[in-house]
């Protein structure tokens, strides 16, 4: 990382974007693709410590990091609050998972005639200090930092356990839809993990539906489709959800 200080009257966003584009085109090849992020902080107090200026420009970058459609980000006062929130979520996550603070909620799914088909697995964080947290306050952060796979795996286990309970009680016609995020494909051996879970709980794979957004599939079509095809052949039902993402989605849209 490097810092450049320019007079406000000399700052030209288009010129900066053009230079970044040129740099990236010179550096990339068939294997590696360079992506540059620029954080812009407007200095309003010349007596402010240089380190603070640098940190604020970095905060602006952190807001768009991982989003390859973004290049330049401008600091605003909300960045500090957002960054502190993100850091606290990440710092508390592993302990919260270990302590059982995350809970699976089930949202019923019906067909057009009102017949119950099953449910979608949602997640809530029963935080000891902040109360019940909804997915929009932490899932995006976990996805951004790559640790969402730990929560996904936890929910998959809970869903399989619940299906086993239903089967034991004689309710053998219902499924639970679980979310598959982009990070799961990279941090987990997805095929072996999911087939291992249904084997562990002795349930049919057709009762554990895999919900994935088209956006996730399109991020690496070849790899994702190969894995999903293997899972479908094993017996899992694949659901494509385009109206929402992650545990915040409201309903299944269509089945592949």
Q: What is each of the regions a protein language model found here?
A:
Residues 11-18, 48-49, 189:
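Short, conserved charged micro-motifs
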Residues 12-32, 55-58, 155-164:
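Alpha-helical scaffold within the catalytic cores of cyclic-nucleotide enzymes
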Residues 1-8, 26, 30-62, 70-76, ...:
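A short glycine-enriched loop-to-beta-strand structural element that forms part of the catalytic core
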Residues 103, 118-120, 173-177, 207-211, ...:
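Structural preference for beta-strand elements that scaffold enzyme active sites
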Residues 195-256:
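The catalytic core of metal-dependent phosphodiesterases that act on cyclic dinucleotides
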């Amino acid at each position: 990382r490097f810092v450049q200080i320019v007079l406000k009257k000399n700052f030209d966003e288009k010129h900066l974007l053009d230079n970044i584009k040129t740099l990236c085109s010179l550096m990339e090849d068939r294997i590696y693709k360079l992506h540059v992020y620029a954080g812009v902080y407007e200095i309003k107090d010349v007596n402010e410590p240089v380190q603070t200026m640098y940190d604020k420009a970095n905060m602006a970058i952190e807001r768009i990091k991982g989003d390859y459609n973004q290049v330049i980000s401008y600091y605003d006062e909300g960045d500090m609050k957002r960054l502190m929130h993100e850091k606290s979520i990440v710092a508390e996550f592993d302990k919260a998972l270990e302590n059982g603070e995350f809970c699976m909620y089930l949202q019923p799914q019906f067909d057009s005639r009102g017949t119950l088909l099953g449910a979608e697995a949602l997640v809530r964080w029963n935080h000891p200090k902040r109360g019940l947290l909804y997915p929009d306050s932490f899932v995006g952060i976990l996805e951004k930092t790559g640790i969402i796979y730990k929560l996904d795996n936890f929910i998959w286990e809970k869903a399989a356990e619940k299906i086993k309970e239903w089967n034991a009680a004689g309710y053998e016609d219902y499924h639970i839809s679980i979310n598959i995020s982009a990070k799961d494909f990279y941090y987990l051996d997805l095929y072996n993990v999911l087939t291992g879970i249904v084997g562990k709980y002795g349930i049919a794979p057709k009762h554990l539906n895999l919900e994935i957004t088209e956006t996730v599939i399109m991020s690496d079509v070849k790899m994702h489709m190969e894995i999903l095809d293997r899972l479908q052949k094993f017996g899992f039902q694949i659901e494509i959800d385009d109206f929402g993402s992650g545990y915040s989605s409201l309903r299944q849209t269509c089945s592949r």
